[in-house]
Amino acid sequence: MESFVAMKVVCITVLFVIVAVNESATSEARTSSAAKETKKKNVTLHFPSYIRNPQKLALELLEICKNNKSRNSLPSTNYSAINDKYVDFKNCTFLCKHAEDRNVTLDLPPNTLCGPNGETCAEKSKCVGHIPGC
């Protein structure tokens, strides 16, 4: 009987932890202005497995893309986009799209992981990019 009660306590504790983690992630996403503007939720990003939080990186790159548009005085359209297929972890660059015919290649932030052993874009020569099958 004691083990049954203990099992219930463990299950309830696990449930609370799952709810707390989910709530924490939800509120963090709400605070990001880029996240508020993202129309799709539950997007699957195809980044290498060493990228621990793909959605956070994608939102950061989208913000860099938007800031680049305003710095370069491009026409004020609300369109800025990135595509996970055009993020080059080997060269630490990504493609930023401002309109149908206006693309620019930008640098990934220096602290972006670019290899499975903690390599970052701060030292591009050590980057290994995407490892097939991983």
From Swiss-Prot:
Tissue specificity remark: Expressed in salivary glands. Detected in fed adult female.
Subcellular location: Secreted
Subunit record text: Monomer. Interacts with host CD4. Interacts with host DC-SIGN (CD209).
This protein's name: Salivary protein 15 Iric-1
Keywords per UniProt: Glycoprotein, Secreted, Signal
Family statement: Belongs to the salp15 family.
Record keyword Cell membrane present: no
Ranges for region Required for Borrelia OspC-binding: 48-67
Induction comment: By feeding. By the presence of Borrelia burgdorferi.
Family matches, as Pfam families: Salp15
Stretch forming the signal peptide: 1-21
GO cellular component: extracellular region
Residues linked to a glycan: N22, N91, N103
Main localisation: secreted
Function according to Swiss-Prot or TrEMBL: Salivary tick protein that downregulates host immune system by binding to both dendritic cells, and CD4(+) T cells. Specifically binds to the CD4 coreceptor on T cells. This interaction prevents the activation of the Src kinase, Lck, and its downstream substrate Zap-70, and results in deficient activation of PLCgamma1, the repression of calcium fluxes triggered by T-cell antigen receptor (TCR) ligation, and a subsequent reduction in interleukin-2 production.
